[in-house]
Amino acid sequence: VRTPDGRYIIVRGRLWRASNPDLSNEERQALVDALMDARRAVGAAKRAGDETAEKAARADVHRAKVSLGERGPVWWDDGAPDQNRKLVHNSTYAPWWESSEHANPD
């Protein structure tokens, strides 16, 4: 589920910043590929017990997420605050969420 403005996805009641929609499909896919490679590298480093490689792979994950717009400075320019990782019912989206079918699925 995305917020009406498309800035966040909601997973288990928590807001997670969505990727920057201004990225081209090609840019976005290249960054997602880099992110997934970095995540696999984190797992491989952990399994190998290689703390140096794990730290480097985690830095690659962070860089990819910043480039996607999911971390770092917000990608919108209207001055709205970043509500990443907030519970949706504790955010400015609470009224919308409570009135939506997603908040109270029957």
Describe the predicted segments one by one:
Residues 1-106:
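Extended, charge-rich alpha-helical interface modules
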